[in-house]
């Protein structure tokens, strides 16, 4: 007698005849989390994507799809903004409006390219001072950019009118609405100081509309505003990609070729060059987990500390994983994923998990050999993490691998199951729902009204060729049972409504058999025997599988 009292997933790298006792040769669309066979619910259509969509992002109940590879970063909640790279040739910030509508602006505030021209009546004397002017741009969010180069100096008496011209208007994509004008002012001294210290700053003269072509400055020095603070501000690199938010820090991050860039904390438009980090390899993917930044490259992976207390780049710790694990993905938006355990991405040997302490693990090595892995086109991988499962889709196969059984009280541990879905992209919502983009439709996984039909086929059950099973018993609420011989022929099939034993037809002698289940009902237990009365009286004195 062969008894199946628990059910596992497939292990492609292991020959059928050497599979562990609970493993399967086919486990397709089946739920194994509770130690028995159960059906997932069908997907639920929850939205329509743009034509030829390649990615999808959720923000609360709002979703956004794009026909190119676009990355989106959420930011501090009360800012009411989202940040994007890949939609245009430059990074963007979007203001969230009514009904999820987005108004896009180019991220950053540019430095003016023109130098102001100043004119007025020059004077000399104790009440006169030499001054020069600069100006900055201010955008719709009140963010200010770096100043222009200073104008030529002019010496005038305090309060004398100075005409200022030469303002230029930046590209409309920046959303600049105003100009700040600054002029130099020197602190007053009595003249009897032992050490002469002259403090000269640019102080605010006036904020004017962006459309202003000229301005007359006759403001007294005592009425000037605050000193300029944006001398070292820099807009993000034009080719920035993979924008992410380091949660809890107020810092955005993104990459170019082999450089990692950071914004100043709570200044998302200011990407000062002092924060730039250069790595020795080309960057492929990045992910964030809290204030940790994970970086995969075409060489070694890295973990970077992006904590809020870190100001200059020297303070950001960079840890290298001292094993070459090149990321081979071809640049899909979902070709890496952040999980509670770290970042997962695709290498030539399998899925790599890099933990926050810069340790790594090949999490698919127990299921896929390197040769098996290469066959499924891992360079085309799309990944998601959902309730303890890693969902992996390639151009060849889609599967789910459980990596966190403890949190979700799984009785059987990690299992690998193939899926019918062929998503172009995947994402998870803030409420933890898995969304698949397929056929320009957004599908919510495991949310439909009906159940999905599954197939599960056991390992080879060895009867030694000396006997043939004549009866079967399945504890189920309704499932189709099939028996497959050693020639891979389906020699018996029948719908079984309950656990009443059934008789099998004459099957002939084979060395082994595989028991298969198809349908939507649950299966707690199954047994193959050679005597009907043994199963009828539930005398399970055979080999437990």
Give a label for each model feature:
Residues 288-289, 336-340:
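Loop/turn segments within WD40 beta-propeller blades
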Residues 1-87, 123, 130, 140, ...:
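Beta-sheet repeat architectures centered on beta-propellers
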Residues 54-57, 92-105, 257-274, 303-320, ...:
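Surface-exposed loop/turn elements that mediate protein-protein interactions on large endomembrane-trafficking
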Residues 230-232, 270-277, 320-326, 370:
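A short beta-strand motif characteristic of beta-propeller blades
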Residues 271-313:
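Internal metal/ion-chelating core segments
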Residues 316-338:
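Short secondary-structure subsegments characteristic of cysteine-rich extracellular domains
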Residues 83-84, 244-254, 292-297, 344-347, ...:
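Short beta-strand motif characteristic of blades in beta-propeller domains
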Residues 2-34, 52-257, 262, 268-274, ...:
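Disordered, low-complexity "stalk" and linker segments at domain junctions of extracellular
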């Amino acid at each position: 007698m062969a008894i199946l009292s628990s059910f596992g997933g497939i292990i492609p790298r292991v020959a059928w005849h050497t599979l562990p006792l609970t493993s399967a040769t086919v486990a397709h669309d089946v739920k194994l989390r509770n130690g028995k066979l159960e059906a997932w619910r069908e997907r639920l259509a929850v939205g329509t994507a743009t034509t030829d969509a390649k990615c999808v992002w959720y923000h609360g109940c709002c979703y956004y799809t794009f026909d190119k590879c676009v990355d989106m970063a959420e930011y501090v909640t009360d800012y009411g903004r989202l940040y994007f790279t890949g939609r245009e040739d430059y990074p963007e910030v979007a203001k969230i409006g009514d009904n999820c509508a987005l108004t896009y602006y180019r991220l950053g505030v540019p430095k003016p390219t023109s130098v102001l021209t100043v004119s007025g009546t020059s004077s000399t004397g104790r009440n006169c001072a030499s001054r020069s002017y600069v100006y900055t741009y201010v955008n719709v969010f009140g963010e200010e950019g770096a100043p222009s180069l200073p104008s030529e100096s002019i010496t005038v008496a305090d309060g004398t009118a100075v005409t200022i011209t030469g303002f230029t208007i930046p590209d409309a994509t920046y959303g600049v609405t105003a100009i700040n004008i600054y002029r130099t002012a020197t602190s007053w001294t009595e003249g009897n100081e032992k050490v002469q210290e002259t403090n000269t700053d640019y102080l605010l003269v006036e904020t004017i509309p962006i459309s202003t072509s000229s301005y007359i400055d006759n403001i007294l020095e005592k009425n000037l505003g605050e000193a300029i603070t944006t001398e070292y501000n820099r807009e993000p690199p034009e080719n920035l990609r993979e924008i992410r938010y380091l949660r809890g820090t107020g810092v955005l991050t993104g990459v170019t070729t082999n450089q990692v860039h950071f914004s100043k904390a709570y200044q998302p438009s200011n990407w000062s060059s002092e924060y730039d980090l250069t790595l020795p390899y080309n960057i492929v993917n990045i992910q964030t987990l809290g204030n940790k930044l994970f970086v995969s490259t075409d060489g070694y992976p890295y973990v970077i500390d992006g904590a809020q207390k870190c100001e200059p780049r020297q303070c950001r710790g960079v840890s290298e994983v001292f094993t070459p694990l090149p990321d081979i993905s071809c640049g899909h938006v979902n070709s890496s994923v952040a999980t509670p355990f770290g970042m997962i991405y695709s290498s030539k040997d399998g899925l790599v998990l890099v933990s926050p302490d810069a340790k790594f693990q090949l999490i698919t090595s127990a299921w896929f050999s390197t040769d098996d892995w290469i066959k499924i086109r891992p360079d085309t991988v799309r990944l998601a993490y959902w309730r303890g499962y890693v969902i992996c889709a390639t151009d060849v196969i889609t599967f789910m691998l459980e990596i966190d059984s403890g949190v979700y009280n799984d009785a059987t541990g990690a299992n690998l199951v193939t899926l019918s879905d062929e998503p172009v992209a995947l994402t998870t919502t803030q409420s933890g729902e898995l969304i698949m983009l397929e056929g320009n439709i957004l599908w919510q996984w495991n949310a439909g009204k009906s159940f999905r039909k599954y197939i599960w086929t056991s390992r080879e059950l060895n009867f030694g060729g000396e006997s043939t099973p004549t009866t079967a018993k399945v504890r189920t609420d309704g499932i189709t049972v099939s028996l497959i011989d050693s020639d891979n022929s389906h020699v018996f099939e029948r719908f079984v409504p309950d656990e009443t034993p059934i008789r099998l037809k004459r099957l002939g002698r084979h060395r082994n058999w595989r028991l298969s289940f198809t349908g939507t009902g649950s299966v707690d237990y199954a047994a193959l025997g050679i005597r009907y009365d043994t199963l009828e009286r539930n005398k399970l004195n055979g080999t437990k599988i």
